[in-house]
Curated annotation (Swiss-Prot):
This is Echinoderm microtubule-associated protein-like 3. Residues 134-145 have a biased composition (Pro residues). GO terms for biological process: cell division; microtubule cytoskeleton organization; mitotic metaphase chromosome alignment; regulation of mitotic spindle assembly. GO terms for molecular function: microtubule binding. It comes from Homo sapiens (Human). It comes from the Eukaryota. Residues 16-43 form a coiled coil. InterPro entries: Beta-prop_EML-like_2nd (IPR055442), Beta-prop_EML_1st (IPR055439), HELP (IPR005108), Quinoprotein_ADH-like_sf (IPR011047), WD40/YVTN_repeat-like_dom_sf (IPR015943), WD40_rpt (IPR001680), WD_repeat_EMAP (IPR050630). The modification Phosphothreonine is found at residue 881. GO terms for cellular component: cytoplasm; microtubule cytoskeleton; midbody; mitotic spindle microtubule; nucleus; spindle; spindle microtubule. Homotrimer; self-association is mediated by the N-terminal coiled coil. Interacts with EML2 but not with EML1. Interacts (phosphorylated at Thr-881) with TUBG1, HAUS1, HAUS2, HAUS3, HAUS4, HAUS5, HAUS6, HAUS7 and HAUS8.
Length: 896
């Protein structure tokens, strides 16, 4: 039939699948309602003596342990079958007085006969209803052999004739309705209170219980998602309700934003290197070791609420100004850009400048030097690129003017005269003079003189400039030239029009690089360093622009973006491929910080070492050492990597690509030992079974491909396919015994699969409620449904990971935040500990093998954060106070 399918069958098949899925959900809901009524009638008709219906005060018969409410049968021996599922298995629940709550019934009376409660699940595996769960509420005893209805699967044909199908369907519904347990009195025993509306678990408009209290339902984009409650949970009120005792502390940030930013690398008086990535300003001391002044490693200023775009260091070498972009909040409302002035020794914010005064973001800023840094000039990213001057000590704006409609890439005060400001950018160099306004907000004036190129070719961009000790200015441009601008006498023709008191003209030109010059740096000995783009050269220039020495940056690090002078002859170089290099012109340079250059999605942690692997849109596959905070190795995948997972042995790693291709690499030799293509759509998840015998690959073609794997993980062969999802696969997890899979899809399905039994879909999802999972990364499921915020559209949570000790759940959301919840998290609006720092959607989170650290990936900011887990189940002592949520307050902007 497949070979004869016409071109129009694809949309028709998709529509049929969608209708089948909707019908299945509606049938389950109707069966629950009908079954409740049918069970009540059956008990009245078959089991209840007439005397028990005389009134509420009539005692129950001797054989009954509980009296029934008026007009209802007693709840002594209700029977239980598949609750709105396809497998009709009837079981009886012996009851006796017990605690109220959500349960499978009270405990059995003493002396009652008990039988094992396990029910056989599809594929031969067993699913225990009570064993292994704390305080099981009752014993489930089969009353009759399990009966399996021959309901045809989606996209499959039935063996029965068309005329018999309606009759069989009605028969199945009647059996299910007659056998479904009604937990009569369960709501009354709780005082009629819905646990989701109780003080311990505030109600939610998107979740509710079904009539029997055996499942929870939530809605995403109006779609109902039913999740069955494990048998060991008698009431949601007994589940954890507060935030976890564990907290996170930012341990290390991998990466440096050099690809698309400037003014991003400086050296402080303490010797620490300061730079930024995402919303974090990093203070790095080469050499490693514990953080803090006088030590090593990293410290972090985390007071910003969106991506940092530029930095400036005060002349005292201690205070730092950092400007951020505007961004939007989780509701899509624009946030206001701002400049923070903060102390690099204490990480305390000293001043917040320009809140509400800038548009879109802060593009460039600089401190004055002639007056000990009393003033700060700022250029924003509005269409007019407003130039403003501020009093640093009081946060007061002294002057403001529209600079130009063209891009402004750099700004700076003349170090000998704070009344002179220079800006450069697209096809311009402007010389500004500002006067007055000191002590009077907004009363100062700014006047402009354009730099005239005259006989010299006007470049497209002038990305950088530097002031020389003699007062001249050097500019680097997109043509690879260094121009020397000298002062000329005052312009007597324009004083009435506010002309500048002096003008600058080009006095010399030197061709320094092939391609654009991105950085100029004045050294302490008076020489100048220039960094080229296309040629990746770093050149030292003496008086008269005579080349003294040069070095070339290796190609895989990219072009020179920024230069800073360290201690002695040491230089720090930032590159366009987000690397930070350290060295000198004679000995060369080596990387101290490295990172990805494009959006990240793939993340997995090593099963026995503190290492993790990342991949993304830059086509690089990187293995990181979490102890040394260094890149162990990287290879070029040639294609976009979207997901990865280590084999349990750690010897190989599987990587899924965006073309339907997946690779298996040896982690020691980096050789590709397997290269397979499944379909032509991107792969969103790869996951080894806990015993390493299988590899599951979730694709955007709605299929989970299963492969048998050799003991060393190097060889694999197709075992089967799990087909039944109506949308692309997003997440999947293996059961602890390695026989079953739980999976989520793009249309919010939760499906279960019997892999060992032939990759069959388990239609009876209720039977999987007590199954234990080796990992928990599915974002939809009873144990984690409390992580979803109100009003979610289904895309708000990108990644989820349960810790190996099963104490906490980490969540990556679309609002740049990492959350920590208690596990299980099965209460609506569950509280969490929230951590900021990423400047883009957080795409993935994973715990290391010993739960000592958590790794999170930023999306478009290409950042990798390594968090230390502190507290009850973490690597260190719990802090005395709860974890702080980053904000603009000084106390919460620290993470030392």
């Amino acid at each position: 039939m497949d070979g004869a399918a016409g071109p129009g069958d694809g949309p028709a098949r998709e529509a049929l699948q969608s209708l089948s899925q909707r019908l299945r959900v509606q049938e389950q809901e109707m069966e629950l309602v009908k079954a409740a009524l049918a069970e009540a009638l059956r008990l009245l008709r078959l089991q209840v003596p007439p005397s028990s219906l005389q009134g509420s005060g009539t005692p129950a018969p001797p054989g009954d342990s509980l009296a029934a409410p008026p007009g209802l049968p007693p709840t002594c021996t209700p029977s239980l079958v598949s609750r709105g599922t396809q497998t009709e298995t009837e079981v009886e629940l012996k009851s006796s007085p017990g605690p109220p709550g959500l349960s499978n019934g009270p405990p059995a009376p003493q002396g009652a006969s008990e039988e094992p409660s396990g029910t056989q699940s599809e594929g031969g595996g067993s699913s225990s209803s009570g064993a292994g769960s704390p305080g099981p509420p009752g014993i489930l005893r089969p009353l009759q052999p399990p009966q399996r209805a021959d309901t045809p699967r989606r996209n499959s044909s039935s063996s029965s004739s068309p005329s018999e199908r309606p009759r069989q369907k009605l028969s199945r519904k009647a059996i299910s309705s007659a056998n479904l347990l009604v937990r009569s009195g369960s709501t009354e025993s709780r005082g009629g209170k819905d646990p989701l509306s109780s003080p311990g678990g505030p109600g939610s408009r998107r979740s509710n219980y079904n009539l029997e209290g055996i499942s929870v339902k939530m809605f995403l984009r109006g779609r109902p998602i039913t999740m069955y409650i494990p048998s060991g949970i008698r009431s949601l009120e007994e589940l954890p309700s507060g935030p976890p005792p564990e907290t996170l502390s930012l341990d290390w940030v991998y990466g440096y934003r050099g690809r698309d930013s400037r003014s991003n690398l400086f050296v402080l008086r303490s010797g620490e290197v300061v730079y930024f990535i995402a919303c974090v300003v990093v203070l790095y001391r080469p050499g490693g070791g514990p953080g803090g002044p006088g030590g090593g490693g990293q410290r972090h200023y985390r007071g910003h609420t969106d991506c940092v775009r530029c930095l400036a260091v005060h002349p005292d070498g201690v205070r730092v100004a950092s400007g951020q972009t505007a961004g939007v909040d989780k509701d899509g409302k624009p946030l206001q850009p701002v400049v923070h002035i903060w102390d690099s020794e204490t990480l305390l914010k000293l001043q917040e400048i320009g809140l509400g005064a800038f548009e879109r973001g802060v593009g460039a800023l600089a401190f004055s030097a002639a007056d000990q840094g009393a003033f700060l000039c700022v250029v924003d990213d509005s269409n007019e690129h407003m130039l403003s001057v501020w009093d640093c000590s009081r946060g007061m704006k002294l002057a403001e003017i529209k600079s130009t409609n063209d891009s402004v890439l750099a700004v700076g005060f003349n170090p000998r005269d704070s009344s002179c400001i220079v800006t450069s950018g697209k096809s311009h160099v402007h010389f500004w003079n500002w006067s007055g306004g000191v002590g009077v907000p907004g009363n100062g004036t700014l006047t402009r003189k354009q730099g005239v190129f005259g006989k010299y070719k006007k470049p497209k961009f002038i990305p950088c400039f530097v002031f020389l000790p003699d007062g001249d200015i050097l500019t680097g441009d997109s043509e690879g030239n260094i121009l020397t601008w000298g002062r000329s006498p005052s312009d007597s023709k324009t004083p009435g029009r506010g002309g500048a008191k002096e003008t600058y003209g080009i006095v010399a030109q030197a061709h320094a690089h092939e391609g654009s010059i991105f950085a100029l740096c004045l050294r302490r000995d008076g020489t100048v360093l220039s960094g080229g783009g296309r040629d990746r050269r770093l050149v030292q220039w003496g008086p008269g622009l005579v080349a003294l020495q040069e070095a070339e940056i290796p190609e895989h690090f990219g072009a020179v973006r920024a230069i800073a002078e360290g201690l002695g002859s040491e230089l720090l170089v930032g590159t366009t491929k987000n690397a930070l290099l350290r060295g000198d012109l004679a000995q060369g340079f080596s990387p101290v910080i490295q990172g990805h250059t494009d959006e990240l999605w793939g993340l997995c942690t090593h099963p026995s070492q503190n290492r993790f692997l990342t991949c993304g849109h830059d086509r690089q596959l990187c293995l990181w050492d979490g102890e040394s905070h260094a890149l162990a190795w990287s290879i070029d995948l040639k294609e976009t990597g979207l997901c990865a997972d280590f084999h349990p042995s750690g010897a190989v790693v599987a990587v899924g690509l965006n073309t339907g291709r997946w690779l298996v690499l040896d982690t020691e030799t980096r050789e590709i030992v397997s290269d397979v293509i499944d379909g032509n759509e991107q792969l969103s998840v790869v996951r080894y079974s806990p015993d390493g015998l299988y590899l599951a690959i979730g694709s955007h073609d709605n299929v989970i491909y299963i492969y048998s794997v050799s003991s060393d993980g190097a060889k694999s062969s197709r075992f089967g396919r799990c087909m039944g999802h109506s949308s692309f696969i997003t997440h999947l997890d293996w059961s602890k015994d390695g026989n079953f899979i739980m999976s989520n899809s793009g249309d919010y399905e939760i499906l279960y699969w019997d892999v060992a039994g032939g990759c069959k879909q388990l239609k009876n999802r209720y039977e999987s409620r007590d199954r234990e999972w080796a990992t928990y990364t599915c974002v939809l499921g009873f144990h984690v449904y409390g992580v979803w915020p109100d009003g979610s559209d289904g895309t708000d949570i990108n990644s989820l990971c349960r810790s190996h000790n099963e104490r906490v759940v980490a969540v990556a959301d679309d609002f740049c935040k990492v959350h920590l919840f208690q596990y299980p998290c099965a209460r609506a609006k569950a509280p969490s500990r929230m951590y900021g720092g990423h400047g883009s959607h957080v795409t993935s989170v994973r715990f290391t093998h010993d739960d000592s650290h958590l790794v999170s990936l930023g999306g478009k900011d290409a950042s990798i954060f390594q968090w230390r887990v502190l507290g009850a189940g973490g690597a260190g002592p719990a802090p005395a106070t709860p974890s702080r949520t980053p904000s603009l307050s000084p106390a919460s902007s620290l993470d030392v």
